[in-house]
Amino acid sequence: MGMRMMFTVFLLVVLATTVVSIPSDRASDGRNAAVNERQTWLVPSTITTCCGYDPGTMCPTCMCDNTCKPKPKKSGRRND
């Protein structure tokens, strides 16, 4: 197969994929089906802290009342 023939086949493949993808975009009416069909429980309706939920399961209770002890810094050049 010559270079001219390979280039022609390449152009045909590109043209065919473009023609196939245009009608599918029109059929979707410009909407993203994956977003529209997402379960409502996967999308949070409000932004809350971890303590806005059940503190025992979502985060340590010390984070809710600011009683967590700070972690000691490790020695090193950046922490001096």
UniProtKB/Swiss-Prot annotation:
Q: Please list which residues make up the signal peptide.
A: 1-21
- Taxonomically, the superkingdom here is Eukaryota
Q: Which UniProt keywords are present, listed alphabetically? A: Amidation, Disulfide bond, Glycoprotein, Hydroxylation, Ion channel impairing toxin, Neurotoxin, Pyrrolidone carboxylic acid, Secreted, Signal, Toxin, Voltage-gated sodium channel impairing toxin
How would you summarize where this protein is expressed among tissues? Expressed by the venom duct.
Q: Which segments are removed on maturation as propeptide?
A: 22-38, 76-80
Main localisation, per the record? secreted
A Pfam match: Toxin_8
Instruction: Output the Gene Ontology cellular-component terms.
Output: extracellular region
* Pyrrolidone carboxylic acid modified-residue sites: Q39
Where in or outside the cell it occurs: the entry states: Secreted
How does it get modified post-translation?
Contains 3 disulfide bonds.
Which positions bear Serine amide?
Answer: S75
Give the glycosylated residues. Answer: S45
Q: Name one GO molecular function term.
A: sodium channel regulator activity
Q: Which residues carry this modification: 4-hydroxyproline?
A: P55, P60, P70, P72
Q: What is known of its domains?
A: The cysteine framework is IV (CC-C-C-C-C).
Protein role: Neurotoxin with probable activity on sodium channel. Induces intense repetitive firing of the frog neuromuscular junction, leading to a tetanic contracture in muscle fiber (spastic paralysis). In vivo, shows the same effect as the whole venom when injected on fish prey.
Similarity section: Belongs to the conotoxin A superfamily.
Q: What is this protein called?
A: Conotoxin SmIVA
Organism annotation? Conus stercusmuscarum
Lineage of producing organism: Eukaryota, Metazoa, Spiralia, Lophotrochozoa, Mollusca
